[in-house]
From Swiss-Prot:
PANTHER family: CENTROMERE PROTEIN R (PTHR15581:SF0). Disulfide bonds: none annotated. Transcription coregulator that can have both coactivator and corepressor functions. Involved in the coactivation of nuclear receptors for retinoid X (RXRs) and thyroid hormone (TRs) in a ligand-dependent fashion. In contrast, it does not coactivate nuclear receptors for retinoic acid, vitamin D, progesterone receptor, nor glucocorticoid. Acts as a coactivator for estrogen receptor alpha. Acts as a transcriptional corepressor via its interaction with the NFKB1 NF-kappa-B subunit, possibly by interfering with the transactivation domain of NFKB1. It comes from the Eukaryota. Pfam families: CENP-R. GO terms for cellular component: inner kinetochore; kinetochore; nucleoplasm. Residues 82-112 form a coiled coil. Residues 49-58 have a biased composition (Basic and acidic residues). A motif (LXXIL motif) lies at residues 171-175. It is found in: Nucleus; Chromosome, Centromere; Chromosome, Centromere, Kinetochore. Residues 34-80 are annotated as: Disordered. This is Centromere protein R.
Amino acid sequence: MPVKRSLKLDDQFEENSFGPSKIMRKKSITAFSPTTGTYQLSPFSSPRTPKEQEHRDGPSNGTRKWSVLSSPARQDSTVKGSDGFMMLLSKIERSSEKTMEIMKNLSSLQALEGNRQLEDLLGVSLVPCSLKSEAKKTKELMTKVMKQKLFEKKNSRIPPKEHHPNSFEFLKAILN
């Protein structure tokens, strides 16, 4: 059976319902932008004073640092990084003997020597001088990589273009 429903909203409206609301919040005039005609959503979204803006953007008098990608300092950092890596490898080689001695002296490790779970736990097998040999292999690989990078850098230079004195010589060179 169809039921007809109606909303009785007439009694909820007052005479001043389309007038200003009773609850009004005072909005700061500094948060209003006459350019866009909008209010600022957050009081912290943009600086209010020019001094704050300058501090936020950094110096604009040409002393701003260039991007890391385009600066020559990036090339130096890769060289320093590879040197640092090589230094760490040499430290590992020197300390590998001490580490192997400590591992041999630990009685709990000696009891579990040859156990696969121990090797999984430590991440290395207990083969004598394995740390030293791994560090040596890594060092050799790093020197190969550095040599390859230097070789690629030398070969990546653009060869000087041949200069053709006139259009006839140029076309002749293209056809040959």
